[in-house]
Amino acid sequence: MKPCDEAIRKTLGLADHMLELADEGDEVREDSGCGVLFGVLRDSAFKLKKLAEAERDAHKRKGWWE
């Protein structure tokens, strides 16, 4: 796998991990401040995932994705 594709793959994994962490944090949070924190984490993960998926798809269309 090309280094740029590997970086995109890792970014997708990071976004998935961020979503898992946001879910875990929401389950154990004790105040609204934590709710805001984990909400921002979740929103950021969705934005990051969307960007990384778009870039992965662009690489696939160009025939770069292995």
Regions found by a protein language model. Give the residues of each.
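Short, charge-rich amphipathic interface segments used for partner binding and complex assembly
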Residues: 7-10, 14-62
